[in-house]
């Protein structure tokens, strides 16, 4: 029934007028709410006639002087207070909250906002209108007036998701103040997590883990199927490490992903080049013995057999985790995280003994050095020569590359002897010895004539021209004492140990030397230092390389080479000194080989200008040299370090220096010089004293 019908009920007219004049919010007592029952689902379709109790009569005209807005405020406050006492706090089941909720006060519609809970409590409809709007609306719609009791008595309506979405998605208009806070009612929407308009920014779901065992490993390394099961054990560890970085990988943090992969690929792009070489190493046998393991010297260093083996050795360090291999693998990983390219160069230096051992083993297998049986029949028709080498480095490379080269004069002598013996079916035998070593290091057979048009770059010095092949037979150290008794009649009856390069040994004397070499029980040989000379050769080769563009784009110049002996340049210097002339260029060049005259030579290796000026200040004392200071008797009582220092580098006492210079100037008058004093004045700067300045002022 409507509110107007309620006022016409006779039972309600017994109340006095004073009670009717009392505001409604003060007349209603708490007992009147006892009859209000919570609506159930069966009462959803109920209408206004389903109310459980009657309200006191209400006359709009009598109470027109009471503000409607105040009455609504009081009624709503009591309703909320009574609802709180009866039903307690309204707590929803689902306590999840969306951090990106829309403000529930956005809606301007007077429709009810529902709270879905277990008890299905009736939703409260709030009136957000201002007092003026409410009065105007009530005056216009007085016959169809709706009281707060009719609204409160209506059963709770189950709002659908679509309705809630519509009400919640309403945007607050510009300039609208927020509604007042109602006590006992929270301002959060519940059970709207899955609503499309209230969704937070989408959270990316973690993708499925990547199978590194089949995708990344095969693409990065190109490992063939016939290799050992190397990276199977490591795939699990890398798989776990990669899972920690999957969410960052999709956010653009690629460095973390690369870091996790760096543990698998120790050498980065270099490993891709190593993959195809491994099957070749396992499948290809060693080169044939008759063909030799090296071929040409330059080709051997690039296409030789040991390089694939060294690559497979390096790959084995990464695929195995047993014993010392684990330590080497961790060492390479640490180096790769800081820098990737220097790993290969460093490993090549560290694995050099392994490479040298392979070279040495192949040489011994091929040549059968130091044979047990000596065939003297071939020695009867052979010619013997003594070869003197400047260093054992050249002996090492001669054994390694099976070549030799002598001076121009020595090459011609050996070439003529080889051609002569080749027609007769004989051989050329060479006894090798290093200058100053005190022993012979072996014997080799000359195999080919001298090739004057070919030059090898493997020697420690670049002055040698031409080459010929040799075959080493004996490699052992035989002291000179065992051979010193052999005299050579064709060399002023000197001992064979006192021979010059390419000195021919008569046949009978040569056979005697050969027998001693064969029967001597040696304890040392150049093979003992083979690894040392291999490393030294690598250093020399790297220093001789032309400038290359490094990764920074700059030219990296090679290390300066040691000064080599040049016979033609030495002859020119000797001829120039013999003519007695001295140019200004040599005067300023200072000490060294260019300053041939011992009277004017500066200290060995010292600068030219400063040294010559000191020589001039000392009056060119020809009796002094830079080596005199080394042989003085430092233990004698007459030795004075300070005075001795002053005699060489100039005294600190000007008086002594003045006397010393005057004495030496007297010697210059009687000394023959190969240059004039005017030339000296051109290249020497004098220091003017106060006396000189006074004299110049007097004559000017």
Curated annotation (Swiss-Prot):
Residues 300-313, 324-339, 568-579, 624-645 have a biased composition (Basic and acidic residues). One of its GO terms (molecular function) is N6-methyladenosine-containing RNA reader activity. Residues 1-191, 250-352, 537-612, 624-665 are annotated as: Disordered. Residues 382-517 form the YTH domain. One of its GO terms (biological process) is negative regulation of axon extension. RNA binds at residues 388-390, 394, 404-405, 435, 459, 464. InterPro entries: YTH_domain (IPR007275), YTH_prot (IPR045168). Keywords: Cytoplasm, RNA-binding. Pfam families: YTH. Disulfide bonds: none annotated. Belongs to the YTHDF family. Specifically recognizes and binds N6-methyladenosine (m6A)-containing RNAs. M6A is a modification present at internal sites of mRNAs and some non-coding RNAs and plays a role in the efficiency of mRNA processing and stability. Together with Fmr1, regulates axonal growth in the mushroom bodies and neuromuscular junctions by repressing the translation of several mRNAs, such as those of chic and futsch. This is YTH domain-containing family protein. It comes from Drosophila melanogaster. The lineage of its organism: Eukaryota, Metazoa, Ecdysozoa, Arthropoda, Hexapoda.
């Amino acid at each position: 029934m409507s509110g107007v019908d309620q006022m016409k009920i006779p039972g309600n007219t017994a109340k006095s007028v004073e009670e009717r004049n009392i505001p409604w919010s003060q007349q209603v007592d708490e007992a009147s709410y006892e009859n209000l029952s919570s609506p159930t689902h069966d009462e959803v379709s109920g209408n206004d006639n389903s109310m459980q109790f009657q309200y006191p009569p209400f006359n709009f005209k009598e109470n027109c002087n009471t503000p409607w807005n105040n009455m609504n405020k009081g009624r709503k406050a009591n309703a909320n207070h009574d609802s709180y006492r009866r039903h307690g706090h309204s707590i929803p089941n689902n306590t999840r909250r969306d951090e990106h909720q829309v403000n529930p006060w956005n809606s301007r519609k007077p429709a009810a906002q529902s709270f879905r809970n277990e008890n299905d409590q009736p939703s409260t409809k709030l009136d957000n209108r201002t007092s003026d709007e409410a009065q105007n609306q009530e005056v216009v719609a007085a016959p169809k007036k709706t009281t707060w009791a009719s609204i409160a008595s209506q059963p709770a309506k189950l709002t659908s998701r679509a309705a809630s979405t519509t009400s919640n998605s309403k945007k607050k208009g510009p300039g609208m103040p927020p509604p007042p806070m109602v006590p006992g009612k929270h301002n959060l929407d519940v059970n709207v997590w899955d609503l499309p308009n209230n969704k937070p920014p989408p959270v990316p779901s973690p993708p499925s883990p990547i199978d590194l065992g089949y995708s990344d490993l095969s693409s990065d390394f190109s490992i063939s199927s016939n290799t050992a099961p190397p990276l199977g054990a490591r795939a699990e560890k890398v798989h776990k490490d990669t899972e920690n970085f999957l969410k960052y990988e999709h956010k653009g943090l690629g460095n973390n992903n690369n870091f996790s992969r760096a543990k698998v690929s120790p050498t980065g792009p270099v490993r891709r080049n190593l993959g195809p070489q491994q099957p070749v190493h396992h499948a290809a046998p060693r080169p044939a013995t008759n063909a030799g393991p090296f071929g040409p010297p330059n080709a051997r260093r690039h296409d030789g057999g040991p390089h694939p083996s060294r690559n497979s050795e390096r790959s084995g360090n990464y695929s195995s985790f047993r014993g010392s291999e684990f330590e080497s693998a961790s060492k390479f990983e640490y180096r790769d995280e800081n820098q990737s390219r220097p790993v290969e160069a460093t490993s090549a230096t560290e694995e050099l003994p392994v490479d040298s051992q392979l070279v040495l083993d192949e040489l011994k297998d091929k040549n059968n050095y130091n044979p047990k049986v000596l065939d003297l029949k071939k020695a009867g028709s052979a010619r013997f020569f003594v070869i003197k080498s400047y260093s054992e480095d050249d002996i090492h490379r001669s054994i390694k590359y099976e070549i030799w080269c002598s001076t121009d004069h020595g090459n011609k002598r050996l070439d003529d002897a080889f051609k002569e013996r080749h027609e007769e079916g004989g051989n050329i035998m060479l006894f090798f010895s290093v200058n100053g070593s005190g022993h012979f290091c072996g014997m080799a057979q000359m195999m080919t004539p001298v090739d004057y048009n070919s030059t090898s770059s493997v020697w420690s010095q670049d002055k040698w021209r031409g080459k010929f092949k040799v075959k080493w037979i004996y490699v052992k150290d035989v002291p000179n004492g065992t051979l010193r008794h052999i005299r050579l009649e064709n060399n002023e009856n000197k001992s064979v140990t006192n021979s010059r390069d390419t000195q021919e040994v008569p046949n009978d004397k040569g056979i005697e030397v050969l027998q001693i070499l064969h029967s001597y029980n040696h304890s040392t040989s150049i093979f003992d230092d083979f690894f040392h000379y291999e490393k030294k050769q690598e250093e020399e080769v790297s220093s001789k390389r032309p400038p290359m563009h490094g990764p920074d784009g700059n030219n990296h110049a090679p290390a300066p080479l040691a000064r080599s002996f040049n016979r033609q340049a030495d002859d020119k210097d000797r001829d120039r000194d013999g003519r007695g002339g001295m140019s200004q260029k040599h005067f300023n060049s200072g000490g060294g080989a260019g300053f041939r005259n011992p009277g004017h030579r500066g200290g060995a290796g010292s600068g030219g200008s400063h040294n010559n000026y000191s020589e001039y200040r000392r009056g060119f004392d020809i009796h002094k040299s830079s080596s005199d200071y080394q042989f003085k008797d430092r233990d004698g009582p007459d030795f004075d370090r300070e005075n001795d220092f002053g005699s060489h580098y100039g005294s600190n006492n000007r008086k002594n220096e003045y006397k010393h210079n005057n004495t030496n100037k007297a010697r210059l008058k009687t000394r023959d010089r190969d240059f004039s004093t005017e030339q000296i004045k051109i290249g020497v700067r004098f220091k003017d004293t106060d006396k000189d300045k006074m004299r110049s002022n007097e004559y000017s």
